[in-house]
From Swiss-Prot:
Belongs to the alkylbase DNA glycosidase AlkA family. Hydrolysis of the deoxyribose N-glycosidic bond to excise 3-methyladenine, 3-methylguanine, 7-methylguanine, O2-methylthymine, and O2-methylcytosine from the damaged DNA polymer formed by alkylation lesions. GO terms for cellular component: cytoplasm; protein-DNA complex. It is an enzyme of class 3 (hydrolase). GO terms for molecular function: alkylated DNA binding; DNA-3-methyladenine glycosylase activity; DNA-7-methylguanine glycosylase activity. Its EC number is 3.2.2.21. It catalyses: Hydrolysis of alkylated DNA, releasing 3-methyladenine, 3-methylguanine, 7-methylguanine and 7-methyladenine. SMART domains: ENDO3c (SM00478). The record marks W222 as: Determinant for substrate specificity and/or activity. This is Putative DNA-3-methyladenine glycosylase YfjP. The active site is at D242 (proton acceptor). InterPro entries: Alkylbase_DNA_Glycosylase/TA, DNA_glycosylase, HhH-GPD_domain. One of its GO terms (biological process) is base-excision repair, AP site formation.
Length: 287
């Protein structure tokens, strides 16, 4: 077993990370111990469980990271997932001069934390689209429990190769709509067959990823934007069609109705180039 201490540039509020992670019942979060156990597939495709425990506080963030094997590979992934090499002070300084300054002051130090893999993120987005959040989490939980892997009490999303072999009825039995079953399985087949390479995405520009993924049946702009944000950690995404964002803006700016997309677009100009953080902090303001 290996252990490694990591210090991160402040501010970094890990308790708020745990708050958000705990919204998903699949995440192995222990708030009292201030830790999360993260399932990561190594290059061989095997599931490794990595524990991340907070030792410090938002002003002096320090973590103890531990696992059984593959220390170098796992540490690289943990730093990517938790965005430890991105300095939040630059983001906070930017928003201190904008109409979202109050929200950023209240939630200061909240990082943009990624899903544990791009495939996980893509499947979650496809499954969650056009569902209320409660049932969306129920459906992803059923999906992972039925076809994923459990190690040391922690659930990991299935491999695309596993889902590629399913029949649509296998997902219909979990209360997937027919279309959602088709989108989930067909996209997984593209990945398993090599028609869609997820390993290429980190090296592509946002616009090129949008053009590539939007051609896939069942993947629309909202899904691509969320994959860019929570799968790849891109900093400048603002999903205008997101109901949560619309509600957060309505509440923050005390509007009578949810804002139209052109209004949201005009508002968001001053928040660039950190629109993903504007999205995250607006969501946090209504959670």
């Amino acid at each position: 077993m290996w252990k490694e201490k990591v210090s991160v540039t402040p501010p970094y509020h890990f308790d708020r990370v745990l708050d958000r992670l705990s919204l998903d019942p699949l995440n192995a979060v222990d708030r009292e111990a201030r830790e999360v156990r993260v399932p990561i597939r190594n290059q061989a495709g095997d599931v490794c469980i990595v524990k991340v425990q907070a030792l410090g506080h938002a002003g002096e963030p320090e973590f103890l990271v531990s696992g059984e094997t593959d220390q170098g590979e796992m540490m690289k992934e943990i730093k990517r997932i938790f965005q430890w090499e991105n300095h939040l002070q630059h983001v906070l300084d930017h928003f201190s001069k904008t109409s979202l300054s109050a929200i950023f002051e209240e939630h200061a130090g909240t990082p943009l934390v990624l899903d544990y893999s791009v495939y996980n993120c893509m499947m979650k987005c496809i499954i969650h689209q056009q569902l209320n959040l409660s049932f969306a989490y129920t459906l992803t939980e059923r999906f992972v429990h039925a076809f994923g892997e459990q190690k040391d009490g922690v659930w990991c999303y299935p491999k695309p190769e596993t889902i590629a072999e399913l029949d649509y009825q296998d997902l219909r039995d979990l209360q997937f709509s027919m279309r959602k079953a088709e989108y989930t399985i067909d996209t997984s087949r593209m990945i398993a067959e090599g028609t869609l390479s997820l390993s290429e995405l980190p090296h592509m520009a946002d616009e090129d990823i949008m053009k590539k993924l939007i051609k896939i049946r069942g993947i629309g702009p909202w899904t691509v934007q969320n994959v860019l944000m929570f799968g790849l950690g891109r900093p400048n995404l603002f999903p205008l069609a997101d109901i949560g964002l619309q509600n957060a803006i309505k509440r923050h700016f005390q509007l009578d109705d949810k804002p139209a997309k052109d209004v949201m677009l005009a508002m968001s100009k001053e928040w660039e180039p950190y629109l993903s953080y504007a999205s995250l902090y607006l969501w946090r303001s209504i959670e």
